[in-house]
Amino acid sequence: MEHSSWHALIKAQLPEGYFGKINQFMEQVYSQGIIYPPKEKVFQALLTTLLEEVKVVILGQDPYHGPGQAQGLSFSVPDSIPAPPSLQNILKELSDDIGVKKSHDLTAWAEQGVLLLNACLTVPAGQANGHAGQIWEPFTDAVIQVVNHLDRPVVFVLWGAYARKKKALVTNPHHLIIESAHPSPLSVYRGFWGSKPFSKANTFLKETGQEPIDWLR
């Protein structure tokens, strides 16, 4: 992370010494139990999607907390792992909106400029939201603020009440906010189905002179 295009700009948004606190937190929790994702993948979203490449931000809450699922990209799992219910619903909406994506590993999206960011970057095994409110939110809010300050128009995709609270950080009128219910089975019928976020994002990117995302990769 230290050598990425993100580092200095995120650091400037945070109190002095905050990166050190993050490092201490990670050393502590990874030494005490099973934490997801693997330590080397905690910052995967920022390492895969460089700041100068960001076109779309899809905000999640925290990583999957089952074995082998979390890979540092919101909603994504390796193809060797069955797609969790929310991801199944995302891919179904994509199928209805644009077409069928055969892989449920979303790395190809990240490589095209889709920042797959969780608000909380770590989770204890089996404990959803187990690290919520401890260290990560100021850091990931800073990431959102860095993207907000870009002159280049960006699409922010906010699914569910938690993500939609982050709308307050997106103040730049150049950007597009697409919001709906969360793809979780509990809320998918409250406005996620039929919301067509993928085609809406691509329409905006084309209108602003940018290459659309190949969502089927």
UniProtKB/Swiss-Prot annotation:
Record-annotated active site: D62 (proton acceptor)
Broad enzyme group: hydrolase
Alphabetical list of SMART domains matching this protein: UDG, UreE_C
Compartment list: Cytoplasm
Gene3D superfamilies with a match to the protein in the record: Uracil-DNA glycosylase-like domain
Keyword Ion transport: no
Keywords: Cytoplasm, DNA damage, DNA repair, Hydrolase
This protein's record includes keyword Cytoplasm: yes
GO MF annotations, alphabetized: uracil DNA N-glycosylase activity
Broad class of where this protein is predominantly found: cytoplasm
Family stated for the protein in its record: Belongs to the uracil-DNA glycosylase (UDG) superfamily. UNG family.
The protein's name: Uracil-DNA glycosylase
